[in-house]
Design a protein with these regions (language model features):
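Noncatalytic, basic helical substrate-engagement surface that gates or grips nucleic-acid strands
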Residues: 1-87, 93-110, 192-193, 199-218
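Acidic, divalent-metal-coordinating active-site segment for phosphoryl/phosphodiester hydrolysis
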Residues: 91-92, 150
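Non-catalytic nucleic-acid-binding/docking modules located in mid-to-C-terminal regions
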Residues: 4, 9-16, 38, 48, ...
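A conserved hydrophobic position in a structured secondary element of the catalytic/binding core
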Residues: 88-89, 157
């Protein structure tokens, strides 16, 4: 979807592009978070080139040092509420559905609160806990082995949140002898870490990027395309 198409459909007063500037915040929780060793170098170069071109064209490119684009968007949503429309296909951003509006660029449709509840089977305030229980191997978010969306939804409906699940885990691991409860009881810190990893930052120090900033945050293509 092109920028001009987005502007025509959504008719925003202004438009901003969020970029990643590291993930130091989450590396401190899990050093293996989003290990980039196997990331496609061609895709990285393409994203960097597009970012450079956006700045040349005078577009507003936003970043927060040490944080991800998700955190920039979450902060904007927290600051601007329903006036903010996030254009994203990232499921993690569904956590913000009560704060702002979300537009799916591939489906070309706005995601509603009922869409989110129907997809995940939990209340919107439980979505972060849902994502933490499920985990995400691609991002090195451990979660709980054997817990998928249906099981996570069942646990959250019964115990309310991760704290409630953790409080019940020792007793349930003994009384039920179920592997899922045993894994939760023996991996409490992993589950807490998973919750902290998926939690979005809503008070990021956002700055508008310049070409010099891109060098600082590691856009390797800048030297070639300057």
């Amino acid at each position: 979807m092109t920028i001009s198409t987005l502007k025509r459909i959504l008719q925003p007063k202004e438009i901003h592009f969020a970029i990643e500037a590291g993930h130091d915040h989450r590396d401190a929780i899990n050093p293996d978070y989003k290990d980039r060793a196997d990331k496609d170098p061609e895709l990285v170069a393409e994203i960097e080139a597009i970012t450079n071109q956006l700045i040349r064209d005078g577009e507003s490119v936003l970043y927060a040092m040490g944080l991800e684009a998700d955190d920039v968007m979450a902060t904007m949503a927290f600051q601007h509420g329903k006036e903010c429309i996030l254009v994203t296909a990232d499921k993690d951003m569904h956590q913000l559905i009560d704060l702002c509006r979300i537009y799916h660029p591939y489906d070309k449709a706005e995601i509603t609160r009922s869409d989110v509840v129907k997809r995940w089977g939990v209340e919107t305030y439980q979505l972060g806990d849902m994502l933490a229980l499920n985990g995400d191997k691609a991002d090195s978010i451990p979660g709980v082995e054997g817990v998928g969306p249906k099981t996570a939804a069942k646990l959250l409906k019964e115990y309310g949140d991760i704290e409630g699940i953790l409080d019940a885990s020792d007793e349930m691991a003994v009384s039920t002898r179920k592997k899922i409860w045993q894994r939760i009881a023996s991996g409490k810190q992993d589950l807490i870490d998973s919750r902290n990893l998926v939690q979005l930052v809503v008070d990021a120090d956002i700055k508008r990027a310049t070409h010099e900033d891109l060098i600082k945050i590691g856009c390797r293509s800048l030297g070639e395309n300057k």
